[in-house]
């Protein structure tokens, strides 16, 4: 026994240390793998289950061309479901006849939240039971922002000139005054300023660190989730802390920047908010968010409020920047639209001034810009932000008109791309003979359709219907689309009034980028812009 103790006592300390380290590391690696295994996602098993339903599968992975698969699938199976084995999860593409069935089904049966949560791998980033979009932020957008859109317009008009001057006006000119503009990067900054003015107000919205934080969160989240999806399912839980490290740092910076503003606003009585809102309209979202967020022990949850601000900024910056980038590319590509767009805009502004206005168009005046609205809608029709809309996760079996019954656990959606390009309602129009082919850009396609008596309030950019799915449709149609529409129109008006836009000499429209079901404007593309000589 004594000899055995001596052997133990006199073993090399370093050897003991390394053995212990390897033992501990081995334990944690094994534990991580076991945890990952127990949380194994079912996307890899889903395709096998769907094969049992005898659904046609269109496309072969990896790196499947989803756009091409949708075109083939919807043309081949227009009235029945089929499967696109997209890079992230196989998606059952529902026929358009199913739209009215799924649009209002409750979360307990067909879940929008679970689909978004799964697609963004939110279980690897958020706390248990934490939602991507909290109830306070949803209430702030659905109730307050939508109801107070008119009040936000003056704020946006005030900010838009500064945003363009800062990001485009300072670029160097060539001998003829043309500037090379990296479209997506500059538009991101413009939209961050515009949205920030409403969401957090000045001066924070112009703080370079805040702008960097909101843009970085938008970009890094998408890139990080994409990287994790490329890893085998069992590695994601292990690698997530490393991959999300930069994003967590951005979140902490946002908390640091927001904390003084949140504490200052939270200390005010609600009656003081109303008085303040009457004096200035910027930063309203902060107050609305606080009004819907219960305090815990008399304290505000800065971390959750920062998450809410970053999430809504992400949604606003991402989709709006995509739309405006496409608008600049299309305006440069189809210059024949510029003169009619300017004439319409200048006419509405002149009428506004004649009526005693200051030229900053109100919500009512913006609705008079039929040609502008049509141009924006046509640009989005051919360049939708996402190819599959009304995406849902089935939490119970779903019976379809085709006779198929989809099992719970299925990811499904509707083909927005082909709906945009083949919808039959165009054919029913009395002016069908004037319409250009569906695969051709016609910026005034929808203003012509609206000119038909009875169509005046149809075919608008914000329209959500079975014929127009780019904002979704039904219970979960994008609640922020009305604010986004006005923000886009104000930015587009700034371009039309003060800038000429053209493609770089000898170049065509920068090609879109397709990743999984997403469509992005070319992030390296450039156009040329020059200040207009205003008389």
Curated annotation (Swiss-Prot):
The chain crosses the membrane at residues 20-37. Induction: Expression of the botcinic acid clusters genes BOA1-13 and BOA17 is coregulated by BCG1 during both in vitro and in planta growth. The gene is BOA7. It comes from the Eukaryota. Glycans are attached at residues 65, 148, 180, 420. It is found in: Membrane. Heme binds at residue 478. This is Cytochrome P450 monooxygenase BOA7. CDD domains: CYP503A1-like. GO terms for molecular function: heme binding; iron ion binding; monooxygenase activity; oxidoreductase activity, acting on paired donors, with incorporation or reduction of molecular oxygen. It is an enzyme of class 1 (oxidoreductase).
């Amino acid at each position: 026994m004594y000899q055995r103790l001596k052997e133990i006592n006199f073993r090399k300390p370093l050897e003991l240390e390394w053995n212990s380290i390897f033992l501990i590391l081995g334990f944690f690696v094994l534990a991580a793998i076991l945890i990952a295994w127990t949380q194994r996602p079912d996307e890899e098993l889903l395709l096998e289950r769907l094969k049992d339903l005898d659904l046609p599968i269109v496309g072969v992975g990896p790196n499947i061309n989803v756009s091409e698969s949708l075109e083939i699938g919807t043309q081949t199976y227009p009235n029945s479901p089929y499967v696109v084995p997209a890079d992230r999860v196989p998606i059952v593409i529902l026929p358009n006849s199913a739209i009215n069935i799924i649009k209002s089904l409750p979360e307990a049966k067909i879940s929008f939240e679970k689909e978004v949560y799964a697609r963004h791998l939110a279980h690897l980033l958020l706390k248990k039971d934490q939602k991507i979009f909290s109830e306070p932020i949803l209430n702030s957008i659905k109730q307050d922002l939508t109801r107070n859109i008119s009040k936000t317009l003056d704020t946006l008009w005030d900010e838009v000139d500064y945003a363009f001057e800062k990001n485009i006006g300072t670029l160097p000119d060539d001998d003829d005054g043309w500037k090379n503009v990296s479209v997506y990067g500059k538009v991101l900054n413009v939209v961050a300023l515009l949205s920030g003015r409403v969401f957090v107000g000045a001066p924070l919205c112009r703080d370079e660190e805040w702008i960097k934080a909101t843009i970085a969160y938008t970009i890094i989240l998408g890139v990080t989730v994409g990287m994790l999806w490329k890893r085998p399912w069992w590695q994601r839980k292990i690698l997530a802390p490393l991959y999300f490290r930069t994003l967590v740092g951005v979140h902490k910076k946002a908390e640091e920047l927001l904390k003084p503003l949140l504490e200052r606003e939270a200390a005010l009585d609600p009656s003081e908010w109303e008085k303040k809102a009457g004096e200035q309209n910027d930063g309203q979202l902060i107050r609305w968010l606080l009004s819907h967020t219960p305090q815990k022990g008399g304290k505000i949850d800065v971390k959750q409020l920062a998450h809410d601000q970053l999430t809504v900024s992400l949604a606003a910056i991402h989709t709006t920047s995509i739309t405006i980038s496409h608008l600049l590319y299309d305006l440069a590509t189809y210059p024949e639209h510029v003169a009619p767009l300017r004439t319409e805009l200048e006419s509405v502004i002149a009428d506004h001034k004649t009526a005693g206005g200051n030229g900053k168009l109100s919500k009512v005046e913006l609705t008079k810009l039929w040609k502008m609205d049509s141009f924006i809608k046509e640009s989005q029709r051919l360049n939708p932000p996402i190819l599959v809309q009304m995406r849902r996760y089935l939490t119970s079996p779903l019976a379809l008109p085709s006779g198929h019954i989809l099992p719970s656990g299925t990811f499904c959606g509707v083909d927005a791309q082909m709906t945009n390009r083949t919808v039959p309602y165009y054919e029913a129009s009395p002016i069908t003979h004037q319409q250009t082919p569906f695969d051709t850009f016609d910026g005034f396609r929808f203003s012509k359709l609206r000119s038909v008596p009875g169509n005046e309030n149809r075919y608008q950019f914000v329209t959500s219907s079975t014929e127009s799915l780019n904002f979704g449709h039904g219970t979960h149609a994008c609640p922020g689309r009305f604010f986004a529409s006005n923000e886009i129109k104000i930015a587009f008006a700034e371009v039309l009034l003060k800038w000429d836009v053209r493609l770089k000499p000898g170049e065509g429209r920068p090609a879109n980028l397709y990743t999984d079901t997403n469509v992005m404007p070319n992030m390296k593309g450039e156009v040329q812009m020059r200040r207009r000589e205003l008389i």
